[in-house]
């Protein structure tokens, strides 16, 4: 009987410990052990750019998803849980009846669907509005999903994107599809193994994009990246290191050889 009581007491202690570990912060919606409130902006950051994040249902349940960092940091952002973009998503996203702003969507370039870099787009946009003191705000559409799902989402959204006159843009850093991605231990900003070299999280992609197109872009990018770095720092304590794939190691070795030859 005494042994049974002792077992019950141990079980209750375990349940209390588990409950304590599962306690969620009311502000950032993350477990208390990895709360990010100390790095989140005290006030949501305003942007001229209207940001729409099409959030794949599977990705929204992933514990390492970075879209919540954006919705907790930016004022002018809308998260839409869906597998494809619909007309109503962009017609009512801003909540106004004003004409739709110039629209861009962030996705890597491909031979069949080329994209302009965000820096090139910024130069073209400034050139087109050089006689206007206050250029119209932009609308940025981002697809948050795994690489496979994101490609499916973009393809399923092509009609609406085309009707909106959306321009496909990519980050200045190119994606190398011939190389497997790295891990959290290869970068301060990567949370999990990416499919290709050059891939980044949604939060970093949006931060880099806003850094290029917003008037106060550098400061906005710095704030968002600091939040992401802290999230990665926390998560790295609980993630098991993964060895880079052979293709990635081979690519790094090839890149190092020219540098070593130059030094000789």
Curated annotation (Swiss-Prot):
One of its GO terms (biological process) is tRNA processing. Residues 245-264 are annotated as: Disordered. Changing residue 147 to A: Loss of activity. The keyword NADP does not apply. Coiled coil: none annotated. GO terms for molecular function: metal ion binding; tRNA-uridine aminocarboxypropyltransferase activity. Pfam families: DTW (PF03942). Residues 254-264 have a biased composition (Polar residues). A motif (DXTW) lies at residues 144-147. InterPro entries: DTW, DTWD2/TAPT. Zn(2+) binds at residues 25, 28, 35, 37. The keyword Zinc applies. It comes from the Eukaryota. Catalyzes the formation of 3-(3-amino-3-carboxypropyl)uridine (acp3U) at position 20a in the D-loop of several cytoplasmic tRNAs (acp3U(20a)). PANTHER family: TRNA-URIDINE AMINOCARBOXYPROPYLTRANSFERASE 2 (PTHR21392:SF0). Belongs to the TDD superfamily. DTWD2 family. This is tRNA-uridine aminocarboxypropyltransferase A. It comes from Arabidopsis thaliana (Mouse-ear cress).
């Amino acid at each position: 009987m005494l042994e049974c009581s002792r077992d019950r007491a141990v079980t209750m202690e375990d349940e209390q410990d588990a409950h304590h570990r599962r306690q969620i912060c009311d502000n950032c919606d993350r477990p208390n052990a990895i709360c990010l409130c100390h790095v989140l902006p005290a006030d949501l950051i305003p942007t001229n750019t209207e940001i729409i994040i099409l959030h794949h249902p599977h990705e929204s349940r992933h514990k390492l998803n970075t879209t919540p960092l954006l919705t907790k940091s930016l004022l002018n952002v809308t998260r839409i849980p869906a597998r494809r973009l619909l007309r109503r998503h962009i017609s009512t996203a801003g909540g106004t009846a004003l004409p739709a702003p110039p629209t861009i969507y962030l996705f890597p370039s491909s031979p069949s669907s080329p994209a302009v870099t965000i820096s090139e787009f910024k130069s073209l946009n400034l050139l087109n509005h050089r006689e206007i003191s206050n250029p119209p705000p932009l609308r940025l559409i981002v697809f948050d999903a795994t690489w496979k799902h994101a490609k499916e989402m973009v393809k399923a959204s092509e009609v609406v994107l085309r009707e909106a006159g959306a321009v496909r843009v990519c980050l200045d850093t190119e994606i190398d599809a011939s190389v497997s991605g790295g891990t959290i231990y290869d970068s301060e900003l990567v949370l999990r193994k990416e499919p290709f070299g050059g891939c980044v999280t949604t939060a970093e992609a949006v931060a880099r994009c806003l850094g290029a197109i917003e008037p106060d872009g550098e400061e906005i990018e710095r704030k968002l990246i600091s939040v992401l770095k802290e999230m990665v720092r926390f998560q790295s304590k609980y993630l098991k290191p993964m060895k880079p794939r052979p293709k990635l190691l081979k690519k790094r070795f090839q890149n190092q050889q020219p540098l070593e030859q130059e030094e000789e």
